[in-house]
Amino acid sequence: MAAAATTFFLIGGGTDSGGDSAARRTLTSDEANRLAITRFLNYQAGGRAVTITVPSAAGGLVVTGSVDYRAGIGYGVVRGAGRDTSSDGLIQWTAAAVLVHPMTDTPATAPPAPPASGWYRRPLQKSGSALDSSLAIVLGLGSDRPDNAELLPQNGAALVGKDRVRGHSVDVMTGPNVRANDGTSFAPGSNSSSTVRYWIGGDGTMYRVRAGVASESQPVVIDFDDRKYFPVRAAPGVTPAG
């Protein structure tokens, strides 16, 4: 059955801390090519280690874990601040479902093998949840083929600055509105005035993504860590996409 489409309006705004505020300009051919392959490189790698900082008026959440871009599944530890500490525990998600495993003493990293029991499952919400929107966005940051480099500048992609992320020199680029499907589609070239911001290395490696979600005034920040990626094992009852 075809997956129902869901659109998240992602808006990159504000200033980039630690970055060079260079004048906005159209992407060069090399820059467009790097932006075009960045999602494909995530898929080609199999997966990436990620840290997702989710905004919330109650305090916010941080998810630390891994995303398997070929299987379409993420897994990690979720920790909250302020009133959001009640969300602490393990989390696993696909494009269709979110599973949480509450823990009073949450480990720094998720165990390689998910617990056999104690999971609470719910559908991934299409709107109204900054966490669920963030999880869906992360899954969409991998693609089994490059994007069209020629269309990116035509649709408004631009270079907005330079920065350093954990010692890596990066270019900060914007892309138009990003459309995430109920699968793993995430198209930087979608035609819209809204933008998402990417921190891209000289070889096309994606180091950071920042995007707004409709339910919060602050953006979600997705950092692709230098930690080693470990393949994600599905929790009981979870069927990976791959």
PLM features per residue range, with description:
Residues 1-66, 231-242:
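N-terminal leader/targeting segments and the immediate start of mature chains
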Residues 36-39, 63-71, 91, 197, ...:
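Extended lipid/amphipathic-ligand handling interfaces
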Residues 44-51, 70-77, 166-174, 205-209:
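Short, hydrophobic/aromatic-rich segments at coil-to-beta transitions
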Residues 54-56, 80-82, 95, 104, ...:
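A mature extracytoplasmic/lumenal domain signature
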Residues 56-61, 82-88, 215-216:
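Solvent-exposed loop/turn segments connecting transmembrane beta-strands
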Residues 70-140:
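An acidic-aromatic
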Residues 113-168, 239-241:
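Solvent-exposed helix/loop surface patches that form functional interfaces
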Residues 168-241:
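Gly/Pro-enriched, hydrophobic low-complexity segments
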